[in-house]
């Protein structure tokens, strides 16, 4: 698990650094979080959480500030959260979370991405029941036992703590994610590679050859949609 998250973080960071679409997606998410509550991250924990994630993805400060300033203004633009589920080749499954100001456009685009790239849309719940919502925290370190004990002392329920290649990965209950981050920061850990709520598959599949190529094409088509915020899958390495 530790190596998986380290590899995903490295691959995603490399892509995000050159992808303005990622900046735009975080801009929307920051705007929505700021609009729902106080635009000050020090008093709005949801906003602070999004900003921290944006920084992990190397989103420039001016993008973050612009989204917050927009939320402070008189704009009444409304965004709606959505979730779509579907299937790719050879047992692969995908969950797509969206944030959009035009639900009809988003639904049509997601359906088209599945249909044109070797996938099939499923009904609500057809995939998500095979995933568990968990908190994931990744940071530099090598003493998993010490971190496990620290979290237990902070009354954080932990599923797993692994140390591999100088990286510690924590998987824990979604409701304890904020508590885990606070406990880690109080212990002196300030830099994180990942602090996310994730849908983690109960089992994974490995794809090769044409199946892998088809899946990558489908995944990229969904990821390129400006309304798609997150993609979860049971395919190893994604």
Swiss-Prot record:
<keyword id="KW-0963">Cytoplasm</keyword>
<dbReference type="InterPro" id="IPR048300">
    <property type="entry name" value="TACO1_YebC-like_2nd/3rd_dom"/>
</dbReference>
<keyword id="KW-0238">DNA-binding</keyword>
<dbReference type="InterPro" id="IPR049083">
    <property type="entry name" value="TACO1_YebC_N"/>
</dbReference>
<dbReference type="InterPro" id="IPR002876">
    <property type="entry name" value="Transcrip_reg_TACO1-like"/>
</dbReference>
<keyword id="KW-0805">Transcription regulation</keyword>
<keyword id="KW-0804">Transcription</keyword>
<dbReference type="GO" id="GO:0006355">
    <property type="term" value="P:regulation of DNA-templated transcription"/>
</dbReference>
<dbReference type="Pfam" id="PF20772">
    <property type="entry name" value="TACO1_YebC_N"/>
</dbReference>
<dbReference type="InterPro" id="IPR029072">
    <property type="entry name" value="YebC-like"/>
</dbReference>
<dbReference type="GO" id="GO:0003677">
    <property type="term" value="F:DNA binding"/>
</dbReference>
<dbReference type="InterPro" id="IPR026562">
    <property type="entry name" value="Transcrip_reg_TACO1_YeeN"/>
</dbReference>
<comment type="similarity">
    <text>Belongs to the TACO1 family. YeeN subfamily.</text>
</comment>
<dbReference type="Pfam" id="PF01709">
    <property type="entry name" value="Transcrip_reg"/>
</dbReference>
<dbReference type="InterPro" id="IPR017856">
    <property type="entry name" value="Integrase-like_N"/>
</dbReference>
<dbReference type="GO" id="GO:0005829">
    <property type="term" value="C:cytosol"/>
</dbReference>
<protein>
    <recommendedName>
        <fullName>Probable transcriptional regulatory protein SSU98_0387</fullName>
    </recommendedName>
</protein>
<dbReference type="InterPro" id="IPR026564">
    <property type="entry name" value="Transcrip_reg_TACO1-like_dom3"/>
</dbReference>
